[in-house]
Amino acid sequence: MTTSFEIYNNADFPEVSALWARINRELAPSDMREQFERYIENSINDELARADEAYPQANGSALWVVKQAETIMGTFGIQRITDTDVELRRMYLDGQYRGQGLSRKMLEHAEEHARQQGFHRMILSTAELQAAAVKFYDKSGYELTKIETASAMSNKTVGNNVRRRHYQKILNPTG
């Protein structure tokens, strides 16, 4: 069956919000479930519900859904940070579809889109709780730039002293 990457649209909201919630609940340690629930609510309300503002295509940003037939299997996006930098965001893939090389294809699609938009560098951050993601970015040519302890919640972190790893990758070495 063919897998496609399609630009998110508002009709995708119910399925994508359920996916984001499910994946984050799977990641939540038992002693942080309440904190994760607040994070899920904030992420959906502050980012997904206003995806047109959070990922404006006019400035090179984009949010994609990963589909097979009509089933949404995952999401990923890039947000413009500066004229030269974008941030990889919301790289989520439902567990039943992992291990098939889709994450690599998603990342390659995001990087190629960023290159075509003229961006020089992609940055990202991920919680150390996401061991598979840490390993994936390490293997994908991303350079670790910083490790921090996130004390406050935002739409990028659950807070609660979770350690976050920040990465970068140069997309256009001569750019």
What are these regions (language model features)?
Residues 101, 118:
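Conserved G/P- and acidic residue-centered "switch" motifs that form tight phosphate/ATP-binding loops
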Residues 98-99, 129:
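Nucleotide-sugar-dependent glycosyltransferase donor-binding/catalytic pocket residues
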Residues 120-123, 127-175:
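C-terminal "cap" of GNAT-fold acetyltransferases
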